[in-house]
Amino acid sequence: MWFKKRIIIKETNILLKVDDKGYFKKAEEIILKNRLELERYILKNPYFLTSYFPVDVEDDAPEIVRLMAIAGEIANVGPMASVAGAIAEMLIKNLNAKNIIAENGGDICLRAKKDVIIGLYAGNSKITGEVGFRLKKEKIKNIYGVCTSSATVGHSVSFGEADAVTVFAKSSAIADAAATAICNASRGRDEEEMINNALEKADEIKKIDGIFVVVKDKVGIKGKIPELVKTDKRITLGELFDIY
């Protein structure tokens, strides 16, 4: 059995699904701790918040700060591009649940001993709610990240035009930063050029397994992505979790 709770702390809005509801209180403590450490670091180092480029941090910086800095360096973006994925990753890392999914604004970190299907939300594209990704239990038995960036959905800054760029990686912080970088590159005269530019950008980023790009009703795929499945559910990414 799975239990669900939405945890909202300032900008953090996490939908948590876990196999034991006894983890909810600990989850709130972990989120709050990491947010406070990040906020305190930003007060002393405001450039960490505003930079669109990688930022070097001290070896003794808080773990979440170091995680975000590494993700930003790998994807060649500012560290805050990975904040949602990083908070979700720190949560999964510090909870001992065998089956746990944390969705933070469309960025997902999970660990499970069962197959999980995650739905895709790509704005007004016809693909929204029609397809999902089946993540095999062998792939997600340890921490795994599935993060999506969009130029047409949400309030995050994007310089691209893709409706959705979904990245799969063994770190949700890295997946989040990579999704931002790849989405930023999705520019061009038509859908095909936008997708090709996004796929070329993905070639520059290490430590990601694969990407799925949606521009209107066209898609592009690079690397290894989970099995695509038909969902027939017009529902946002994060609310659709089918567990087997």
Swiss-Prot record:
SUPFAM superfamilies given in the database record: ApbE-like
Protein family: Belongs to the UPF0280 family.
Name of this protein: UPF0280 protein MJ1526
